[in-house]
Amino acid sequence: MNDITIERQEKAEGEAFEKICMWCHGWWGVRDGLTADQVRYNMSHSLGTGRQLPQTFIARRSGKAVGMYQLSMSDDLQSRPDLYPWLINVYVDEGERGKGVCQAMMETVAENAKSAGLEHLYLYTKHIGLYEKFGWEFIETVPTFRTESPVERVYMLKVESRKVKVER
Protein backbone atom coordinates (compact mmCIF):
# COMPACT_ATOMS: atom_id res chain seq x y z
CA MET A 1 0.00 0.00 0.00
CA ASN A 2 2.97 2.30 0.33
CA ASP A 3 2.70 3.02 -3.38
CA ILE A 4 -0.58 4.89 -2.69
CA THR A 5 -0.40 8.57 -1.80
CA ILE A 6 -3.22 10.85 -0.71
CA GLU A 7 -3.01 14.52 -1.61
CA ARG A 8 -5.26 17.51 -1.64
CA GLN A 9 -6.69 18.56 -5.02
CA GLU A 10 -6.57 22.36 -5.00
CA LYS A 11 -6.90 23.25 -8.68
CA ALA A 12 -9.73 22.69 -11.13
CA GLU A 13 -7.38 21.32 -13.76
CA GLY A 14 -5.28 18.32 -14.63
CA GLU A 15 -5.81 14.58 -14.93
CA ALA A 16 -7.03 14.10 -11.36
CA PHE A 17 -9.64 16.86 -11.65
CA GLU A 18 -10.92 15.38 -14.91
CA LYS A 19 -11.16 11.95 -13.27
CA ILE A 20 -13.12 13.17 -10.23
CA CYS A 21 -15.54 15.00 -12.51
CA MET A 22 -16.03 11.84 -14.58
CA TRP A 23 -16.45 9.64 -11.49
CA CYS A 24 -18.98 11.97 -9.85
CA HIS A 25 -20.95 12.51 -13.05
CA GLY A 26 -21.27 8.76 -13.59
CA TRP A 27 -22.03 8.10 -9.93
CA TRP A 28 -24.52 10.78 -8.91
CA GLY A 29 -24.62 13.37 -11.70
CA VAL A 30 -26.58 11.15 -14.07
CA ARG A 31 -28.87 10.01 -11.23
CA ASP A 32 -29.64 13.65 -10.37
CA GLY A 33 -30.13 14.70 -14.01
CA LEU A 34 -26.97 16.81 -14.22
CA THR A 35 -24.80 17.29 -17.28
CA ALA A 36 -21.06 16.68 -17.19
CA ASP A 37 -20.53 20.47 -17.31
CA GLN A 38 -22.79 20.97 -14.30
CA VAL A 39 -20.86 18.38 -12.31
CA ARG A 40 -17.59 20.00 -13.40
CA TYR A 41 -18.88 23.37 -12.15
CA ASN A 42 -19.86 21.81 -8.82
CA MET A 43 -16.51 20.08 -8.45
CA SER A 44 -14.57 23.26 -9.30
CA HIS A 45 -16.22 24.85 -6.25
CA SER A 46 -15.57 21.80 -4.06
CA LEU A 47 -11.82 22.15 -3.74
CA GLY A 48 -11.51 24.81 -1.01
CA THR A 49 -8.40 26.59 0.09
CA GLY A 50 -6.54 26.64 3.37
CA ARG A 51 -8.64 25.21 6.21
CA GLN A 52 -12.01 26.04 4.66
CA LEU A 53 -14.45 23.38 3.56
CA PRO A 54 -15.09 21.75 1.22
CA GLN A 55 -11.80 19.98 0.58
CA THR A 56 -11.11 17.28 -1.99
CA PHE A 57 -8.47 14.58 -1.62
CA ILE A 58 -7.10 12.33 -4.36
CA ALA A 59 -5.59 8.86 -3.95
CA ARG A 60 -2.80 8.19 -6.43
CA ARG A 61 -0.97 5.01 -7.34
CA SER A 62 2.20 5.62 -9.32
CA GLY A 63 1.00 9.17 -10.00
CA LYS A 64 -2.35 8.07 -11.44
CA ALA A 65 -5.63 9.14 -9.76
CA VAL A 66 -7.31 6.00 -8.40
CA GLY A 67 -9.70 7.32 -5.73
CA MET A 68 -11.12 10.35 -3.98
CA TYR A 69 -12.97 11.67 -0.96
CA GLN A 70 -14.24 15.05 0.17
CA LEU A 71 -14.82 16.84 3.46
CA SER A 72 -17.89 19.07 3.24
CA MET A 73 -20.26 21.04 5.47
CA SER A 74 -23.26 19.67 3.58
CA ASP A 75 -24.48 16.58 1.81
CA ASP A 76 -27.56 15.59 -0.15
CA LEU A 77 -29.14 13.66 2.74
CA GLN A 78 -32.24 15.82 2.98
CA SER A 79 -33.75 13.98 5.94
CA ARG A 80 -30.97 15.05 8.37
CA PRO A 81 -29.94 18.67 7.71
CA ASP A 82 -28.94 18.90 11.38
CA LEU A 83 -25.92 16.65 10.83
CA TYR A 84 -22.63 18.14 9.61
CA PRO A 85 -19.78 18.15 8.58
CA TRP A 86 -19.63 15.19 6.19
CA LEU A 87 -17.25 12.78 4.53
CA ILE A 88 -18.69 12.59 1.02
CA ASN A 89 -17.90 11.19 -2.42
CA VAL A 90 -15.70 8.34 -1.21
CA TYR A 91 -14.89 6.65 -4.49
CA VAL A 92 -12.34 4.10 -5.69
CA ASP A 93 -11.84 3.49 -9.40
CA GLU A 94 -13.41 0.14 -10.34
CA GLY A 95 -10.11 -1.39 -11.44
CA GLU A 96 -8.49 -0.47 -8.12
CA ARG A 97 -11.11 -1.86 -5.74
CA GLY A 98 -9.86 -4.43 -3.25
CA LYS A 99 -6.26 -3.21 -3.61
CA GLY A 100 -5.90 -1.06 -0.48
CA VAL A 101 -6.98 2.30 -1.91
CA CYS A 102 -9.96 2.74 0.42
CA GLN A 103 -7.83 1.80 3.43
CA ALA A 104 -5.13 4.29 2.43
CA MET A 105 -7.74 7.03 2.06
CA MET A 106 -9.46 6.20 5.36
CA GLU A 107 -6.11 6.35 7.17
CA THR A 108 -5.90 10.06 6.25
CA VAL A 109 -9.50 11.18 6.87
CA ALA A 110 -9.18 11.92 10.60
CA GLU A 111 -5.89 13.78 10.18
CA ASN A 112 -7.24 15.91 7.33
CA ALA A 113 -10.47 16.61 9.23
CA LYS A 114 -8.52 17.63 12.31
CA SER A 115 -6.35 19.94 10.18
CA ALA A 116 -9.58 21.56 8.98
CA GLY A 117 -10.59 22.17 12.61
CA LEU A 118 -13.27 19.47 12.73
CA GLU A 119 -14.10 17.39 15.80
CA HIS A 120 -16.25 14.78 14.07
CA LEU A 121 -17.58 13.73 10.67
CA TYR A 122 -20.71 12.00 9.42
CA LEU A 123 -21.19 9.82 6.37
CA TYR A 124 -24.05 7.84 4.93
CA THR A 125 -23.74 4.66 2.95
CA LYS A 126 -25.34 1.34 2.04
CA HIS A 127 -22.11 -0.49 2.87
CA ILE A 128 -22.41 -2.51 6.07
CA GLY A 129 -19.13 -3.41 7.75
CA LEU A 130 -16.81 -1.29 5.61
CA TYR A 131 -16.50 1.89 7.64
CA GLU A 132 -16.75 0.27 11.08
CA LYS A 133 -13.27 -1.20 10.63
CA PHE A 134 -11.95 2.34 10.18
CA GLY A 135 -13.39 3.58 13.47
CA TRP A 136 -16.78 4.85 12.27
CA GLU A 137 -19.72 4.31 14.62
CA PHE A 138 -23.17 3.41 13.26
CA ILE A 139 -25.71 6.05 14.38
CA GLU A 140 -28.99 5.21 12.67
CA THR A 141 -30.80 4.22 9.49
CA VAL A 142 -32.54 7.19 7.86
CA PRO A 143 -34.84 7.82 4.89
CA THR A 144 -33.20 9.45 1.87
CA PHE A 145 -36.37 10.58 0.04
CA ARG A 146 -34.95 8.96 -3.13
CA THR A 147 -36.65 6.06 -4.87
CA GLU A 148 -33.48 4.22 -5.96
CA SER A 149 -32.12 4.09 -2.41
CA PRO A 150 -34.92 4.81 0.09
CA VAL A 151 -32.82 4.31 3.25
CA GLU A 152 -29.15 4.70 4.14
CA ARG A 153 -27.00 4.05 7.19
CA VAL A 154 -25.49 7.08 8.96
CA TYR A 155 -22.11 6.82 10.68
CA MET A 156 -20.03 9.19 12.79
CA LEU A 157 -16.27 9.42 13.28
CA LYS A 158 -14.91 11.27 16.31
CA VAL A 159 -11.83 12.95 14.92
CA GLU A 160 -9.98 13.98 18.10
CA SER A 161 -6.39 12.88 17.68
CA ARG A 162 -7.47 9.60 16.10
CA LYS A 163 -5.13 7.99 13.66
CA VAL A 164 -6.78 5.05 11.96
CA LYS A 165 -4.55 2.11 11.11
CA VAL A 166 -6.09 -1.17 10.07
CA GLU A 167 -4.09 -4.35 10.32
CA ARG A 168 -4.75 -7.03 7.73
Write out the residue ranges for each language-model feature.
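Conserved N-terminal entry element of GNAT/NAT acetyltransferase domains
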Residues: M1-E18, E160-E167
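Active-site rim helix/loop that mediates acceptor-substrate recognition in acyltransferases
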Residues: C24-R60
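Short hydrophobic/aromatic beta-strand or adjacent loop that forms the aromatic wall/cage
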Residues: P54, S149-Y155
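Conserved beta-strand in the GNAT
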Residues: T56-I58, K64-S74, W86, Y91
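Active-site beta-strand termini and strand-to-loop segments that position acidic
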Residues: R60-S62, L157-K158
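A conserved beta-turn-beta hairpin within the catalytic core of GNAT-like acetyltransferases
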Residues: S74-L87, R97
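Conserved acetyl-CoA-binding loop-helix of GNAT-fold acetyltransferases
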Residues: N89-V92, G98-E111
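Conserved active-site alpha-helix within GNAT-family acetyltransferase domains
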Residues: S115-E119, T125-P150
